[in-house]
Regions:
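N-terminal Rossmann-fold NAD(P) dinucleotide-binding loop
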Residues: 27-28
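Glycine-centered short loops/turns at secondary-structure junctions
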Residues: 22, 38-40, 182
Length: 208
């Protein structure tokens, strides 16, 4: 009997503390965390694990630099703290990556002002990454000779993080961790209905 079939059998008539519907990044992380703490966890997904939003990311794990434009400081702070936590918790999966923005006369911000924003972003993130830099056109040429600097005023360089492997594998790592902790996980299973009876939820699922 294959792994999926064995997990389908466990779902049939099984009693669980938690049923997680959806095996994307949120469901997978929740399952791994709960199962590791001894909860009886079941995870289902109507498609494959990480088959929808969680496999259509850019692999970027960022702190929300763009949101500084709207002065959403708390949001940026929360995103930076989450990014930092992920880098520390999964050093083999997440790495720091440098970004460079080249700015000309038509850019909305001058290099010095963009540099102030990048520095604020770094400070809000507790200085966890390498510090940002304001770049002259000459520095941009040294770093990236392919970039034309004829009309550039300068640029900035700052850091965020990215998933080294693809996003789907990152998600499935949490599914595997949940399985190893005793969770029941089955893909291509849809949630049909649920009703409360005898102090418990009875759930009807369908093997698709």
């Amino acid at each position: 009997m294959g792994l999926r079939e064995a997990n389908i059998d466990q779902l049939d008539g099984g009693i669980f503390d938690v049923l997680i519907v959806g095996g994307g990044i949120n469901g997978a992380v929740s399952a791994a965390a709960l199962a590791s703490r001894g909860a009886r966890v079941a995870v289902i997904d109507r498609g494959d694990f990480a088959n929808f939003t969680s496999m259509q990311s850019s692999n970027l794990v960022w702190g929300g630099f763009k949101y500084l434009e709207n002065y959403e400081i708390k949001l940026v702070r929360d995103l930076c703290m989450s990014r930092n936590h992920l880098i520390k918790a999964y050093p083999a999966n997440l790495k720091e990556i440098r970004f460079m923005a080249a700015l000309d006369e038509n850019s909305p911000y001058k290099p010095w002002f963009a540099g102030m924003g990048a520095t604020a972003y770094w400070v809000i993130g507790n200085g966890f990454t390498k510090p940002p830099k304001v770049l002259t056109p000459e520095k941009i040429t040294q770093k990236e000779p392919i970039v034309r600097t004829d009309n550039l005023l300068g640029g900035i360089e700052y850091s965020d993080a990215y998933i080294v492997d693809n996003d789907s594998r990152f998600v499935f790592g949490f599914i595997r961790s949940a399985l190893n902790s005793g969770a029941t996980c089955a893909n291509y299973v849809s949630f049909e209905s649920a009703r409360r009876q005898g102090g418990r939820w009875q759930v009807q699922l369908r093997d698709t």
